[in-house]
Amino acid sequence: MALAAGLMLSLNSCMDDYDEPNTDGYLITSPESLGEVNYSIAELKNDNASLFSQTNAFEQVKEDKIIEGVVAANDCGGNLYQTLLIRHIDESKPEGDADRDQAIVLGVKHTWLTPYFQLGQRVKVNLKGLYIGCYSKLPKIGQPYYTSSGNLRLGPVLLQLCATNVELVGQPNPDCAECQPIALSPEWLRATANRNYLNYPQLVSVTGTIQEADGEAIFAPESLQDAGYGVDRTLVNSENNTKVTIRTSTQNDIAFTVMPEGEHTYTGLLSYYSNWQIQLRSVSDIQ
């Protein structure tokens, strides 16, 4: 009996050792609060207007500036590589105010971000130590890196910096307002005044017909990929011939999808370089 009791005590002791495993090593975001939000994406853009107006430029943030927003786009479909679209809607500001609905890209160097940053997940980001600026005119939070041609550009932050600079807030809510796209009219897309950093990046939907669709062609065959490993398709609106580029990287589900013929609505991340461009998040963004 004494031996049996001893064995049971030993077994219980071993089980207790494994009841609550230490999972700290599996966390990629801060396990502690970053503090109170003291800044907004709108303030970030307005305070750095000259920086965000450039094509390729960046600077490091030296102070504790904590912003908050919701993940409105991620790499769930494999098309937005190392990219999170962080969007914040300030309901205290009136409809039509440019500062009410602002977004920015947070680049994170990791092969698949979706398990950690699901659509509808609210996050805080402490900008201190990170870099802000533009990559090919796209407003972004990241870190500088050297391209293969030796140019210094704003790339994604290292994954380990998420543990000190990024905090998850609550649970993901994919039905939240920030995950609902803004429907852009042909008139809005044509207006030159809208082609500025306050209007992109953003989650939007556009309607039109893909010029290259023939019932067989797919979005992004490798045979057509450019130096950026992507393929551009042209979406045309029937009302006023407004054109938007749909850019798709190769080697993902969207890339191998046959482009639908006729008029459809496409949802994705909006940017602007020499023309308006959207990148779909997943195949379900085609309606």
Where are these regions (language model features)?
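OB-fold nucleic-acid-binding modules
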Residues: M15-Y81, L85-S92, R100-Q287
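C-terminal motif of bacterial Sec signal peptides marking the signal peptidase cleavage site
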Residues: L9-S13
